[in-house]
Amino acid sequence: MPAKKKTTRRNTKKELQKKAATRKMIAFFVGLLLILFALARLGIVGILLYNIVRLFIGSLAIILLLLVAAIMILSVFRKQFLKENKRIIPAIILTFIGLMFVFQIRLHQGLNETFHLIWSDLTAGRVIHFVGSGLIGAIITEPAKALFSVIGVYIIAAVLWLVAIYLMIPGLFPKMREDLHQRLAKWKEKRAEKVEAKKAVKALKKLEEEKEIPEPQTILPEAENSLFTSAPVEIPINIPEAPFEENENPVLEENPVDDEPVNFMNTNNYNGNYKLPTIDLLAEVPVKNQSGERENVRKNIGILEETFKSFGIGANVESAVVGPSITKYEIKLATGTKVSRVVNLSDDLALALAAKDIRIEAPIPGKSLVGVEIPNAEVAMVGFREMWEAGKTNPSKLLEIPLGKSLDGGIRTFDLTRMPHLLVAGSTGSGKSVAVNGIITSILMKALPSQVKFLMVDPKMVELSVYNDIPHLLIPVVTNPRKASRALQKVVDQMEERYELFSRYGVRNIAGYNEKVQRYNAESDEKMLELPLIVVIVDELADLMMVASKEVEDAIIRLGQKARAAGIHMILATQRPSVDVISGLIKANVPSRIAFAVSSGTDSRTILDTNGAEKLLGRGDMLFKPIDENHPVRLQGAFLSDDDVEAVVTFIKDQSEAQYDESFDPGEVDENQVGTGASNTGSGDPLFEEARNMVIIAQKASTAQLQRALKVGFNRASDLMNELEAQGIVGPAKGTTPRKVLVSPDGEFIGGVEE
C-alpha cells in the first residue's frame, strides 16, 4: 500500500507540471497573437489594444510590443539566454526611458494635452496623432524639463543610452579608450617629427642666407646708377599715381556740359533746404482683433484631417500660421502619398471647409510639407504707416521698398535696383493701383529730387495725375499713348547717352560714375552733379500696346536688357494680363513680377508662369515672384489712402516747384498718324510697317518675298502688297516681275523715274 501511494503522488506531480506547461504555452500563443493583432492594428480589437498601450507609453507602443514579443519568444525557446545575459533587461529599460524623454520633448505638450490626444484616438477608434511617450512619459518628463530644461532632458537621455551601451557591451569603452590613447600618441609623435623637420629647414635656410649675404653687397653698388636699377625704382612710384592724376581729373575738367547730351545740370540741388516727408503725414490704421481665428483654426484642422481620411489619404496637420487675410496649414503626408492627390482635392477641401476659395502650395519650398491656404473669417487690414515703421529699410538704398506683410507677420521688402524691373498685373479692384502708389510714396519718402527722377505714364489720366508738379518728375505725367511711346524712346536715348558717358570716364555703372563725381567734387572748386536714378512707371500697359505696340515693346525690351547699369528701372502695370499685352519678349526682360487677383489660370500663367493668382482674394492679396526666387511668395499689401498720398505730395510741392527736363519732352503728335498698333488708321495689319521698311530697303517687292520674310500666308501677304500700293510705296503689278518700289531708302519719292 505505501508503494502505491508513492507512485500515485509521482504521477500527480508530473500531471501538474504538464498542465502548467500547457497553460504557459496557451498563454504564450494567446499573448503573442494579441501582440500581433495590436502591432498590425487589425480590426476593432487590434486598434483598441494598441491605443490602450499608447495611453501609457504613447508612440513607443510599437517598440514595446516588439520587445515584449522578443522576450516571450526567448523565454520559451531559449531559456538560458536571459540567464546568461542578465544585463540585457536593465539595458533595454534604460534605453526605453531615454526614448520616452525624447519622444515626449518632441510632442511639445503637457500631461493634459497628451491625455486628450490619446483619448480622442481611443474613443474614435483610430491611430492618427503623434502622442509622444504617453501618460508615463509625460509624468516623468514634465518634472525633469522643469528642473533641468529641455537641453538637460536630452543630456539625461544621452547618459542613459551610454550606460545601456556599457551594460550590453562592457568591453566597448575600455577598448575605445585604448584606441584613443594610441591614436593620440601617434599624433603627438608625428607632430614632434614635423616640428623637428621645420626647425631643420629653418636652420638650413638661415645658413644659406648667411652664406649669400656678401654677394648682393658687392653687386648692388656697381649697378646703383645703371638703367637696370633705375627702372624698378620709378615703376612702383608712377603706376598707382599717373593714371589717377593724369587721366581721371583732367577727363572731368576737359568735358564741358555742352558735350554731354544730358548731365542733369538743369536740375537744382535740393539737398540743402529740402526735407523728406515724415511718417506723421500718414494716417494710422486700427489693428484688427483676430482672436476669433484661433477657434476657427482648431475646427479647420479637424475638418482637414477628416476630409483627407475620407479620401484615403494619410495626412496630419503639423502647424497653422495665421496671416492678415489667410491661414496657412502645413500638412505632413504619409509616406508613399502622391502630392498630386492633395492638389486635385482643392475643390473638395473648399466644400468641406465652406471656404470662398483655397490655394494649395505643393510642396512648400524648403519643407517636406504641403501648404493649404484658407481665407480668414476676419481680414486684418495692413496699414502703410505700420508697414513702413516695421519694414526698417536701409536709408542708403533709395529704391528699397516695403511691399507687404507675409504670413508670419514679417514685412517683405524688395530693392528695385536688384529686380531690376517689375511687372504688376491684376484685375480691377485687386489692389494694383494702391500697390503702385505705395511704391511711389516709399521712394518719395526716402529720395531727394536730385537723387531719383520719375517718368510716369498714365493713359487712364486719373491714377497718377496727383503726382503732377512734384520736383521728382522729369516731365509732367504723360497721358497720351502716342506721346508715351515717344517718351519711352527718350528714356532709351538717355540710357545710350549714359553708357557713352560711362565709357568716356572708364566706369561700368551709375554707382561708379557718381563715386568719381564725388571724388572730383571733393578735390575741385567746380562742382558736378551726380546722375539721378530714373524710375519709369507705366500704369496701364495695355492702352499703350493697343496704339503703338511695336514702338512700346521695342523700348521696353531695350530698357530691360541694358538699363540696369545706367540706373534706369521700369515698373509696368496692367489690368489685362493677356499675351498680346505681355509678350514673351517683355516677360523675358522683366523678370520680377507681382500678381494680384486675376480671373483665370491663363492670366496667372501669363504673369507668373504658374497657377495661383486666380485663387487670390483681392484687396491687396498678392503673389510676389522676384528675380532671385523660383516660387512666388504670398503677401498682403498695405492700404494707402488717397488722403495719405495727397498729404505726402502736398508736403513735397510746398518745398519746391517742379523743373522739367525738356530733353524728355515727347513733343506734339499727330493723332491721325499711322502707327503700328491694332487701331491704326492707315492699315489694320500690325506687320504693315515692317513690310514697308523691308521693301524700301530691298528696293524690290513681291508677294512671295513678303511671305518668306514675314512668315505669313499668301492671302495676308497679298493684302499687305495691296496696302503698300495704296499708300504709294510700290507700283502696280506687272505680270510675274517684281513690283517697282516708288520710295528710295532715303525716303525720297522716285515714282516718276522709269528705267
Swiss-Prot record:
* InterPro entries assigned: AAA+_ATPase, FtsK/SpoIIIE/SftA, FtsK_alpha, FtsK_dom, Ftsk_gamma, P-loop_NTPase, WH-like_DNA-bd_sf, WH_DNA-bd_sf
List the membrane topology term(s). Answer: Multi-pass membrane protein
What Gene3D superfamilies does this protein map onto? 3.30.980.40, P-loop containing nucleotide triphosphate hydrolases (3.40.50.300), Winged helix-like DNA-binding domain superfamily/Winged helix DNA-binding domain (1.10.10.10)
Location relative to the cell? Cell membrane
User: Region labeled Disordered — which residues?
Assistant: 660-685
Q: Where is the signal peptide?
A: none
Top-level taxon of origin: Bacteria
Which GO cellular component terms, listed alphabetically, does the Swiss-Prot or TrEMBL entry include?
Answer: plasma membrane
Comment, domains: Consists of an N-terminal domain, which is sufficient for the localization to the septal ring and is required for cell division, followed by a linker domain, and a C-terminal domain, which forms the translocation motor involved in chromosome segregation. The C-terminal domain can be further subdivided into alpha, beta and gamma subdomains. The alpha and beta subdomains form the DNA pump, and the gamma subdomain is a regulatory subdomain. The DNA motor and the gamma subdomain are both required to activate XerS recombinase.
- What family is it from? Belongs to the FtsK/SpoIIIE/SftA family.
Listed name of the protein:
DNA translocase FtsK
What gene does this protein come from? ftsK
